[in-house]
Structure formats: C-alpha cells, structure tokens
A protein has these predicted regions:
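Boundary at the C-terminal end of the N-terminal hydrophobic targeting segment
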Residues: 41-47
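Bacterial N-terminal signal peptides that target proteins for export
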Residues: 6-7, 18-33, 37-38
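Short, Gly/Pro- and small/polar-rich lid/capping loops
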Residues: 48-60
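Short, low-complexity intrinsically disordered segments enriched in A/P/G/S/L with frequent Arg
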Residues: 8, 12-13
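Intrinsically disordered, low-complexity linker/terminal regions across diverse proteins
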Residues: 49-50, 282, 287-290, 308-315, ...
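Noncatalytic, helix-rich "gating/capping" subdomain that lines the substrate-entry/channel surface
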Residues: 113-406, 410
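Hydrophobic/aromatic-rich, well-ordered segments within soluble, folded domains that form packed cores
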Residues: 61-82, 213, 217-237, 600, ...
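Active-site-surrounding "flap" and adjacent substrate/cofactor-binding loops of secreted or lumenal enzymes
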Residues: 50, 67-70, 75-136, 140
Length: 704
C-alpha cells in the first residue's frame, strides 16, 4: 500500500499536482558541483555576507523576433525554450523544475554529508542516512525481488468471505489511510475549523482521473490497454501465472471502471459545499447496509460517532455496489492494487515496469531520474521537515524573510485598495472581504515548530520495504492522533525546501516555503518590477485563492460560511462562469480543449495575482522616476518577469494527462490567456485590435 500518503485538509498549491484529494500527497520535489561550475545563484546561501548582482531578466531567454502583441509567452520565453530542449527524464521542464532540481541537489549534499559519517541511532540524521542508503542499494532490493510482498499477498489469498474482506480492508486502512476502495483521514471540520473530525473520501483510481474509465475515445482505450499490460507485467513478476495475472488485471480494471461510474469528477471535487456532508455513523449505517460501516470503524479501533462523507453520493452508490460485489473479484482487485502501490519500493524490474507505463506512456517521459534523485525524493517524502531544518540554516537568510514580509504586507494593501474600488460589490460584502484579508495568517520560509519524528522507527536492521512501511504507519498514526482534538494551526503542509506555495481555507493562511524564495521568483538584488512580477504575483495568487470560487465560501476564521449578499454572490458567479467558458474555448492539443471549470480557481487566482501585484508595484513606485532597464519600462519588466515563471517544454502526453486532472492551466495559458484579460498589459505593450493578444474590452474578464 505504498507510496506514502496520509490524511490532510484541502490546500491550494500554486503550481503542483493537486492536493485536492483528502490525502496530502507528499509532493516534494551535488551542490558542490554546482558551486564549482558557477551554476548555483550566489544569493541562495544564508551563510554569505555579500551577494553578487543577479540579472532579473535574461534577454537571451527571450525571442525578440516574436511580437509581444501576438504571442507574449513565446516572446518572453522563446530563447529559453530553444536552449532547453526537454530532458529525457522529464515530461515537463520549466522554471519550477530548475528550482526543484537546485533544491534537490542541495538536499543531496546535506544527505551525503550525513551518510559519510556514523550517526547515532534514534536521531533524525540516522533515519535519513539509513533510508537513503537503503534506497540506493539496488543490489539488495533486486535480491529480495517481490519477497517483501509475500505476507500481504498470502493474507489476500486467505480472504474467502465478506467478513474476511472487511477485516483486511480495516487493517490496511488503519495503516495506510488511503485504501483501494475508499480513503479516510482526519482534518479540520470546515464549518467548525478549530476542531478536527474524521472523514471518508472516494476511491483514488489507479489512473488518477475517472475520464479514462468512462470515456470511449481511442486515447482512453489505449491508456486502459497499457494499464492492463502493466498490471499483468507486475503480477507475473510477483509469481502469478499468465492466466492468473490476466484474470487479476482484468478484475482490477473492471472494478475501477465500475467505481469510476459513480466517482466525482475532478471538477466536482473542487466544490467545497458538495464535498461537505456531516453524517452520524449510526444514521449512515442504518440507511446503507451493503458495507458494515460501524464494524469497519470498530475493527480499526476508532471511536467515531460523526464523520464527513465528503463525496456522499459516491458512498451511497458504493454501499449498494459493494453488497453485490463478488469476494473473489474484490480479492483480485486488492491484489492488483497492493502490488502496483508497492512497485516503486521493490526491485528494479518492478520500478521499470511502473515507469514504462506511468512515466512513458501516460506522461511521455523517456527515462527515469537517476537513482540518487529518486532516493532523495523518498527521504524527503518521509523526513521532509528534518531535512528542511538543515536546509533553511544553510540556504535561507533572515533578510529574505524580512523582505518577503514587507512584500506580503504591500500586496495586502493593494488587494484592500482593489476591493474598495470594485464597482460590482456592495459595502456590506466589501466589509467582510476586508476583514478576511486582514485576518490572513502569513507563513514564510519555515515553521516555528518542527515535526517530531521520535516515534518513527527506522532501523538499519530492517529491510528497505519494512522501513517504508514503518514510515507510512508513523504518518497515518500522526494524522489519526488529531481526531477530536483542536486543529494545530502551526503545522505546515509543505517542507521548507519545496518550490511551491499554498493557501489553506480552513486556517485562512498563505504559506511561502523557503524553496520558492529564490531567483527568478524572488531576488533580493533585482529591481521592484521583476520581484513584483514574479514573487509578487505568487503572493497575490495565494491571497486571491481566499476569494476564488472555493475560498470565497470560507470566512475570516476559516469556516465555510456565506459572508456575501445574495446579489453580490450572483454577480460573482456570473463573472467566474464567463472566465471558465473563456478558458474552455482554448485548444491545448489536437482534438482537446482546456477545462475551464476544473482550472477556474487557479485562473481566478492568476488574474487576481497579476492585478494586485501590478497595483502594488505602482504604489511602490509612486512619486519616483524609475528608469528603463535594458530598454524596458517597469510595467514591461513586470509582465516579462511573470511570463518567465511559466516558460517550459512539455510532451503532448503530459498536456493531455494534466488537462484531465490538474486544476492548474498549462503554462502557455497562464501567460497568453490570462494576460489577454489584463488592461494594463495592453497599455504596456501597445496591444491593438489587429493583434493576436487582443480581445475586446467587453470580453475581458477580471474578477478581483
């Protein structure tokens, strides 16, 4: 039941693969070599007393042959795109990936320092060293093959009745949280956000999106065929005969397809109100008798009287479906999922099989990342904050944190001014919006309180697989211990070294880890236009999430509570629907259009970030004579800096995959489509009606 996941509240990340599911996916992303080659920006090290000037915008990254009025994305990024063809190990490579590679190399340097000397058992340094060395030890993992799975597979073979099945599901879910049939966890009650409650969430399908199972397109059929071939491959590696492997693979896909029919779509999962359904266990069990809900919780040893059945209609349909499902089919389904979930933790032939489907076919990658990189990622998934504590001491300065606090406050002022200027919003709603804005909890760099790993039993006497299981148990136990207790608002959902940012509605907090606070996002030595166009828009983006189609359902205290007048809400929703339709009209690949409903929240946040960051820049430059740099005005540098954040090369397979499941628009759309709605952009680059970047004023949509 690996990889490692555990329950967590909904968060709104800036760029990364969605954390919209109830589980928080641990989405973490040699230093000496980088320093020797002069690749690492000097301003990254907190140990330096003086930093060299780093240009805010590299002219060679641009393509000046392209008119900004026709394709601003290409104008700003064309040079970089040409110089950086897609690397074989990537399905998408851009600015975020460069910074993640840098952070990963920094973490590698930290880890390799630890393994070079003896460590005291029971310390975080020891845990890091053991896990990293075992992850690197392919010879031992290859020697073991699928042996680590044998106890689990034998337990599955022993299932003969629904009672046996219930015991197995309860046992596995107590350890892993996100089970094969449905997920569970502990998170804040969205209508009483100071307290934690138990919740159920729908199944996490093997392919990530229900579209693959419910669509009858040639693409979907091809993906399902590849998925079946992958399952057969890993089942045969696990000792099953050709006939057994074929039967189990077909049963796995058949059951996933049945579950997909009543699973919520990725767009529906964004609907906060639709995904909040508090029900007593007694009432739900009385009305839904196909699955023994009370017995399930009892077998897990959990005292739960009330829970949030997040996707309530899924669970009602699931209960009915389960009552008629055959034990042998469910056993086969669990077998397929158990092996697939463990594949990356087993021998190289399993890892290769997993990559050949999920990496190559589904995403278009050509090769795996090197083993050291994969091993660093494993350690970060398990011990992210332990590594982060070392990381921030080396690579994040107090001056950077102070400057970020200043920028955040400037953006708050700009958003406050913007709210007051909205012509469509009533004074009553404006007052409550201002209250929410002034109540933002701001987290920058790293947490004040670090995670306690003392209960994590990682030991060199155990196998790699056993240590990963111990880590999974630790994280699941860490989540479950919060049941019925007050929410710990000091916790972070990301490690400090992550190149990302998020907004959390139930705590009304915005968080900017140290990893993203480096060039080109944040540069202590660059001019204001570049910083406001980059990290300023990021700050504004996260702030605007508090007021997007989801965040706007939560009040200043983090509770799902309507603070709008009916008329204002109606105007807001009408405007956001115009934005959704605008993005949905854009073709992203042959025969495929963007999903403006799925990406609505992120598109609102992008446009809000652009609007208020530019206003903040104007406020910062008020009364100043600001000269051009490299021939560009501050306004032009602002928009170029923003566009540079999203420059990337990407495979068509990844475009198609992300369009199905990612609530973020593709980089091209985050530049060209977003900027078409921003009036100051037209003035900055003299956009005229005959230009391709032009849309008529009546068709432009800006919510905030």
């Amino acid at each position: 039941m690996l990889p490692l996941t555990h329950g967590a509240p909904l968060a709104r990340p800036l760029q990364l693969i969605s954390i919209m599911q109830i589980k928080k996916q641990l989405i973490t992303l040699g230093l000496s070599a980088l320093l020797a080659q002069g690749i690492l920006p000097a301003s990254l090290s907190a140990q330096q007393t003086k930093t060299e000037k780093v240009p805010g915008i590299s002219l060679s990254d641009m393509d000046r042959k392209v008119r900004p009025q026709d394709n601003f994305y290409r104008y700003s990024n064309g040079g970089w795109i040409r110089k950086n063809p897609l690397k074989p190990a990537y399905s998408r490579f851009g600015t975020f990936d460069i910074l993640r590679d840098t952070a990963t190399s920094q973490i590698r340097h930290i880890v390799e320092e630890l393994i070079a000397k003896p460590q005291t058992k029971g310390t975080n340094d020891y845990r890091v060293a053991v896990l990293y060395k075992q992850s690197l030890d392919s010879a031992e993992r290859n020697r073991q093959g699928y042996k680590p799975l044998i106890p689990e597979l034998q337990a599955l073979q022993g299932i003969q009745t629904k009672e046996d099945l219930l015991k197995h599901i309860a046992q596995q879910d107590q350890v892993y949280g996100q089970g094969c049939l449905f997920g569970t966890g502990v998170a804040a009650d969205e209508k009483n956000s100071t307290m934690n409650i138990f919740l159920f969430t729908q199944t996490s399908l093997g392919l990530g999106s229900r579209d693959y199972y419910v669509e009858s397109t040639p693409e979907a059929k091809q993906i399902l065929a590849g998925y079946e071939a992958y399952l057969v491959r890993i089942l045969k590696l696990s000792g099953y005969s050709d006939a057994e492997a074929s039967r189990i693979a077909k049963a796995t896909i058949r059951i996933e397809t049945e579950l997909a029919q009543f699973s919520y779509s990725n767009t529906e999962l964004r609907d906060s109100q639709k995904n909040y359904n508090i029900v007593t266990i007694a009432d739900f069990a009385r009305d839904n008798k196909g699955f023994d809900w009370s017995g399930y919780l009892r077998l897990r040893g959990l005292d739960v009287a009330t829970a949030n059945f997040m996707q309530l209609n899924f669970f009602k349909a699931f209960d009915k479906w389960y009552s008629s499902a055959k034990v042998e089919d469910l056993r086969d389904f669990l077998t397929g999922h158990t092996i697939s979930g463990a594949a990356n933790s087993l021998s190289d032939d399993f890892v290769q099989a997993h990559f050949d489907f999920f990496g190559k076919q589904l995403s278009g990658r050509k090769e795996m990342h090197p083993r050291w990189r994969r091993s660093v990622d494993v350690v970060q998934n398990v011990l992210g904050e332990a590594l982060g504590e070392v990381y921030v001491k080396r690579y994040f300065s107090p001056e950077a944190k102070e400057r970020m606090i200043e920028l955040v406050h400037n953006l708050q002022k700009a958003l406050s001014q913007r709210v007051e200027a909205l012509s469509w919003m009533s004074p009553e709603t404006k007052k409550r919006a201002q209250e929410k804005l002034s109540s933002f909890v701001i987290k920058i760099g790293y947490p004040d309180k670090w995670m306690d790993y003392s209960a994590l039993d990682i030991d060199e006497s155990k196998t790699y697989y056993q240590n990963l299981e111990a880590a999974t148990r630790f994280m699941q136990a860490d989540n479950l211990k919060d049941l019925g207790k007050p929410v710990d608002r000091t916790k972070w959902l990301m490690s400090p070294q992550e190149v990302n940012a998020y907004y959390m509605p139930t705590t009304n907090e915005i968080c900017f880890p140290a990893g993203i606070l480096q060039p080109p996002f944040f540069n202590m030595d660059a001019d204001d236009a570049v910083n406001y166009g980059a990290i300023g828009v990021v700050i504004g983006h996260e702030m605007t999430h508090g007021f997007d189609d989801e965040g706007s359902n939560f009040d200043k205290d983090g509770n799902m509570n309507n603070w709008w007048t009916p008329e204002d809400r109606k105007k807001f929703e009408a405007t956001t629907q115009r934005l959704a339709k605008q993005f949905s009209a854009v073709t992203v690949a042959p025969g495929l259009k963007a999903n403006g409903e799925l990406t609505l929240g992120e598109n609102i946040a992008d446009q809000g970030g652009l609007t208020i960051a530019y206003l903040a820049l104007q406020m910062a430059n008020e009364g100043k004579q600001v000269a051009k740099i490299d021939g560009f005005t501050p306004a032009q540098r602002f928009y170029i800096a923003y566009a540079r954040l999203w420059g990337q090369n990407i495979t068509e397979a990844e475009i198609r995959r992300l369009t199905k499941l990612d609530p973020h628009s593709l980089g091209l759309l985050r530049v060209n489509q977003a900027l078409k709605n921003i009036d100051p952009f037209y003035k900055a680059f003299n956009i005229r009606p005959t230009d391709k970047m032009y849309i008529a004023p009546k068709d432009r949509v800006v919510v905030w």
